[in-house]
Amino acid sequence: EIVGRLSAGNIPALLGLENVKAGETIASVKPFVPFESVHYVTEPVVTMAVEPKFARDLPKLVDLLRKLNLEDPNLVTSINEESGEYLISGMGTLHLEIATTLITKTGLEITTSKPIVIYREAIRSKAGPVEGKSPNRHSKISIEVEPLEDAVIELMKSGKISEYGDKTEMARSLREIGWEADEARGVWSIDEPYNMIVDVTKGAQYMQEVRDMILAGYRWGLKEGPIAYEQIRGLKVKITDISLHEDPVHRGPAQIMPMTRRAMFAAFLIAQPTLLEPIQRITTKVPGDLLGAVTSVVSQKRGKVVSVDQKGHLVYVTGELPTVETFDLSEVMRGQTAGRAFWGLEFARWSPVPASLIQSVVEQIRKRKGLSLEPPKPSDFME
């Protein structure tokens, strides 16, 4: 039945909403407060490039990627701005294999790159305030950085605080976990994955006029961190002071954005930066006589066994291992267990790359991206 009006409590079917994702709010009036968006526990941890075998099929590929993204919010599609490649990112190699299979089933021939693990950049301590100057040297900003508290991240995960939530309620929630009142009131933005910028300046002139430019510089930095041009995670940025030129001509985006990013990067590099790698939880079901083989595979893959449970003649082994070590897991596990083990993988958490490996991992990432092998120093972003 087609109706023009439906009261609360009913479930309608809507047609023609081609670009609407699951969890979005649809409204015909403005302004309106959207419903809380759907929060997904997992984040994309593996990415690959995909392109059509024939250039004429590019529009079809773009359309298919858009539809896949709408149907599966955990699958992220993007464009590499430097190479022009279309990238798909998901929760693991199997997730990407399913996506590419769905594409080829439409009759479109594609080629793909080898899957690459996604890393995150983070800090382990507090640093700043660090001063950054605009390219024309007429304006300057002071920034502090620190790891975002676990309690705040939990509030984000639960949806109690969000970018589009009530600011008064957000401030109250932050005060309840120990934030000072001025910090709680000064939150400008909450950005994925779990980052926040806070204004604690007092009586700064022209601040509202440059606010969007500061946010743009901050988000520019979040998108590609200074260590390996990987996305930054779990960062709290505080603006502690700012001095702006009185003439708007001298404080435009070309001045404010790089000023903000440079100060943020200098502080970031002082605050004991590190790389985070995605960790997968592996659950394995295997006959008891093959328990040693399974635990051996997990250990060989830089992993650890979390629990072992006996149920009848079968043993259930739960462990954790880095995503980068799972690419050939099928072959290794089959070889060690003669194909008698059944297992599944799911994203568990982000964990710092071991100190013994971080230099080589950073160099590999920077080499792949065409960067110099040595990461920048704080002084590279300071006057």
Can you describe what each PLM-predicted range is?
Residues 1-383:
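Accessory interaction regions appended to the cores of large information-processing enzymes
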